[in-house]
C-alpha cells in the first residue's frame, strides 16, 4: 500500500506542470545534446520513476547578473569564412548569431595580431610615433571587420565585444620584439592612446567596443607568439595613471576595463588582491578576465570566490578557452565525448602540476567549466576561435587548436562539432541581464546551474557526465516537471511564461 501511494504521489507531482501551466500561463521546453546523437533536440517531459533526483529552484535567491556567452572574432576565423561559399559562410554566422542559432551575446577580438592571425601586424609600425599619427586599422578591414559586420546584421539582440592586445608594437617594448618583453616607460601614455584610437576607429566602422583587457596573458606564453609581460603592480599603475584617465578624457569611460586575463588559480588571487586594493586603480577596473588553461578539470572555485570578494559588483569573465594542443577530429562526434584529448600541460606542465592536466572529454570539459564558473560568480564565458580548419589553424606559430566549427575550404565543407551545441545550451537560453539563481540538488553527481531571464523565463542547464541515466524532478514555486537525462548528456530546461514568449 505504501509503495502504491508513493508512485501515485510521484505521478501527481511530475505532471503538475501541465495542469498548472494551463492555469498560470507557464510552459516547459526541454532541449538535449547527448553522446548518443541528440543535438539540441527538443524533448517532452518524461514519465516519473522511483528514486528520482530532486532539484528545487529558488528564484528569490539571486547572485551575479549574466553578461553573456560567445566566441572570438580572430583573423584566422574571418579568413576561413572568406574561403567558403556565400551559403556556408552565412550558415555558420547564422548558427552563431541568429535568433534561430546559438544567439551569441558576448565576444572577443584581438588588438594587433595574435597567434591566430595570418601573420604579425600592428596598427602603427612607425618607431617613435608617440602621437600615433600613423595609426590605422586598415589591416582589419580585409577579413576581421567584414566578419564582425555580418554577425551584427544577423544578430537580433546584438552582442558585446571585448578587445585584447597580445602585444604593443615592438618599437614600444624593451626588447623590440613581438614576443615577450615589457612596455617601455616612455611609451606608456602612447600605449594608452593606442587603446583609445582603436576604440574610436572601430566605432567609425559601426562596431562598438564594450570592453578591454589590458593584456592577454600578462605572465607570458614562453615567448612562443605575440606577448608582452606585466606584473600586477605594473598593470595596476598603467590603468590608474594612463589607460583609465585617457579613456575618460576621450569620453570613453563607459568602456569596461578588465584586469589580469590569464589562468585561474593562485596567480589570479594575487592579481585580484593587488589590482583592487588600490582604490584609485580599482575605480577604473570594471572587473577581471580569466582563462581556463590551468587545468583540464578544475575551475578553481576558491580563486573565483576570492576574486569576487575582492571586487564585489565587478565582472569576472572567462575570456578564453579552447581544446588546445589538438588537431581537430573531422566529423567524429564520438571523439568529443571521449576522454582522449590532451592539453599543453599533458607534456609541458611542471611536475608538481601534472595532476591538473589529465586526459579529458572535450564536451565534458566545456560543460563542467561553464557550469562551475557560473556557480562561482563568473558572469560571462567566451570561447576562443569560432571557426578553424582541419589542421586547427591558420596559426602562424602552428599552435593548433580545435573550434566548435571546423571547415574544409577546398571542399567547401562545414562540420559543427558537439562543442557548438554545448555552447548553445548556455548562450541560446541564458540571456544577458539574467540573474543566476539558487537551487537545491539531491544528487551531487548531476551538475547544474540556473538563471532567471529578463523576460521572466527560467533556464536550467543539467549535465550528466556519468554512465547511468537519471530522471530529475525540477520544481519551482508550485510547479514541478520531470525530465529523463541519459548518461553523457546535457539538457537545457526552459520554463517560459507564455505572455512573454514573443520576446524570444
Where are these regions (language model features)?
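Conserved, mostly hydrophobic/aromatic
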Residues: 71, 103, 161, 212, ...
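Structural preference for beta-strand elements that scaffold enzyme active sites
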Residues: 68-72, 106-108, 158-162, 208-213, ...
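Active-site neighborhood of glycoside hydrolase catalytic domains
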Residues: 190-208, 218-329
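Carbohydrate-binding surface patches
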Residues: 428, 439-477, 488
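Aromatic/acidic polysaccharide-binding cleft in carbohydrate-active enzymes
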Residues: 318-421, 438-441
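N-terminal catalytic cores of secreted or lumenal carbohydrate-active enzymes
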Residues: 36-209, 230-233, 241
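Bacterial Sec-dependent N-terminal signal peptides
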Residues: 1-25
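C-terminal beta-strand-rich structural cap/linker in extracellular carbohydrate-active enzymes
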Residues: 485-504
Amino acid at each position: 500500500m505504501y509503495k502504491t501511494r508513493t508512485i501515485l504521489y510521484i505521478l501527481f507531482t511530475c505532471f503538475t506542470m501541465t495542469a498548472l501551466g494551463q492555469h498560470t500561463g507557464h510552459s516547459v521546453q526541454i532541449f538535449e545534446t547527448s553522446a548518443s546523437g541528440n543535438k539540441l533536440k527538443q524533448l517532452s517531459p518524461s514519465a516519473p520513476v522511483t528514486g528520482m533526483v530532486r532539484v528545487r529552484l529558488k528564484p528569490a535567491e539571486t547572485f551575479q547578473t549574466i553578461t553573456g556567452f560567445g566566441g572570438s572574432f580572430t583573423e584566422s576565423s574571418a579568413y576561413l569564412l572568406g574561403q567558403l561559399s556565400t551559403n556556408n559562410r552565412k550558415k555558420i554566422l547564422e548558427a552563431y548569431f541568429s535568433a534561430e542559432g546559438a544567439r551569441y551575446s558576448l565576444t572577443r577580438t584581438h588588438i594587433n595580431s595574435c597567434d591566430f592571425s595570418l601573420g604579425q601586424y600592428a596598427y602603427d609600425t612607425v618607431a617613435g610615433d608617440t602621437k600615433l599619427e600613423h595609426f590605422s586599422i586598415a589591416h582589419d578591414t580585409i577579413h576581421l571587420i567584414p566578419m564582425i559586420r555580418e554577425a551584427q546584421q544577423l544578430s537580433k539582440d546584438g552582442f558585446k565585444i571585448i578587445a585584447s592586445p597580445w602585444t604593443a608594437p615592438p618599437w614600444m617594448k624593451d626588447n623590440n620584439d613581438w614576443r615577450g618583453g615589457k612596455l617601455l616607460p616612455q611609451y606608456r601614455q602612447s600605449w594608452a592612446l593606442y587603446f583609445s584610437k582603436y576604440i574610436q576607429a572601430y566605432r567609425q566602422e559601426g562596431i562598438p567596443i564594450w570592453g578591454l583587457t589590458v593584456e592577454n596573458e600578462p605572465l607570458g606564453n614562453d615567448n612562443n607568439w605575440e606577448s608582452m609581460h606585466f606584473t600586477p603592480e605594473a598593470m595596476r599603475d598603467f590603468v590608474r595613471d594612463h589607460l583609465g584617465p585617457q579613456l575618460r578624457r576621450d569620453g570613453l569611460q563607459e568602456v569596461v576595463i578588465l584586469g589580469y586575463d590569464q589562468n585561474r588559480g593562485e596567480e589570479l588571487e594575487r592579481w585580484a588582491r593587488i589590482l583592487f586594493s588600490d582604490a584609485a586603480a580599482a575605480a577604473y577596473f570594471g572587473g577581471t578576465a580569466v582563462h581556463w588553461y590551468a587545468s583540464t578539470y578544475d575551475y578553481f572555485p576558491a580563486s573565483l570566490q576570492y576574486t569576487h570578494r575582492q571586487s564585489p559588483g565587478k565582472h569576472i569573465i572567462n575570456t578564453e578557452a579552447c581544446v588546445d594542443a589538438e588537431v581537430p577530429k573531422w566529423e567524429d562526434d564520438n571523439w568529443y565525448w571521449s576522454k582522449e584529448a590532451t592539453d599543453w600541460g599533458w607534456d609541458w606542465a611542471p611536475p608538481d602540476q601534472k595532476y591538473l592536466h589529465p586526459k579529458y572529454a572535450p564536451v565534458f570539459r566545456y560543460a563542467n567549466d561553464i557550469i562551475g564558473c557560473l556557480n562561482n560568480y563568473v558572469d560571462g564565458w567566451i570561447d576562443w576561435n569560432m571557426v578553424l580548419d582541419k589542421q586547427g589553424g591558420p596559426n602562424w606559430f602552428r599552435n593548433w587548436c580545435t573550434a566548435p566549427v571546423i571547415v574544409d575550404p577546398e571542399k567547401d565543407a562545414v562540420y559543427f562539432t558537439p562543442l557548438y551545441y554545448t555552447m548553445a545550451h548556455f548562450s541560446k537560453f541564458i540571456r544577458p541581464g539574467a540573474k543566476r539563481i539558487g537551487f537545491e540538488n539531491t544528487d551531487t553527481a548531476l551538475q547544474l546551474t540556473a538563471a532567471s531571464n529578463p523576460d521572466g523565463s527560467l533556464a536550467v542547464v543539467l549535465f550528466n557526465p556519468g554512465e547511468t541515466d537519471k530522471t530529475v524532478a525540477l520544481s519551482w514555486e508550485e510547479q514541478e516537471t520531470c525530465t529523463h537525462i541519459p548518461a553523457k548528456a546535457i539538457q537545457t530546461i526552459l520554463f517560459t511564461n507564455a505572455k512573454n514568449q514573443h520576446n524570444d
